[in-house]
Amino acid sequence: EIVIAGTDNPNVPGYLANAKETFKHVPQLNFTGYVKEVEVAPLFTESAVVVFPYTSTTGSSGVLHQAGSYGRAVVMPNLGDLANLILHEGYKGEFFEPNSIPSLAEAIRTIVSNDVYRIELGEANYKAATAFPMERVTAIYLKEFQNIIKTKKAAKKEGF
């Protein structure tokens, strides 16, 4: 089964409706639309691989962190914040070249045809996603906010 989860990118309205119509003849292709919070866990736990068919990114991918927290292998474009997360935070996956259908297909095939590799990627992603417990993430944010406040107070004292 192939599941297309989520809604249109605001920059490309109608994309999913068009894809659904174009590929309506493909068996076992399901479009979920908006995914409610209670449906997130089953969606990930029942998936062998999570694919990010993005051609551009803006900001860190929460979906990558979610996929990692469920121990899932990922396929993603070799660009922006996704590539940085692989490089700096310990996530692992198969890259594809954005806008290249053959590259995307090859990346998916590489994972789904090799169970050992797929499991290895999922384990690495779980480790990366759980490396920083929420308490530690919260403490890092609070410290950073305190530093910002301290800097602003010091600048205000100096008349800036």
Show where each model-derived region lies.
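Glycosyltransferase donor-sugar binding loop
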Residues: E1-A17, G33-Y34
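Nucleotide-activated donor-binding/catalytic signature segment of Leloir-type glycosyltransferases, i.e.
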Residues: L16-V38
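Short acidic alpha-helix that forms the nucleotide-activated donor recognition element
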Residues: K36-S47, H65, S69
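Acidic donor-binding loop of glycosyltransferase active sites
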Residues: L43-G59, R72
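Short glycine-rich donor-binding/catalytic loop of glycosyltransferases
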Residues: T55, R72, M76-I86, P98-N99
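Conserved acidic donor-binding segment of nucleotide-sugar-dependent glycosyltransferases
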Residues: H88-I101, T110-D115, T130
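C-terminal alpha-helical cap of glycosyltransferases
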Residues: T110, M134-F160
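A short, well-ordered alpha-helix in the C-terminal region of glycosyltransferases
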Residues: T110, Y117-A131, K143, N147
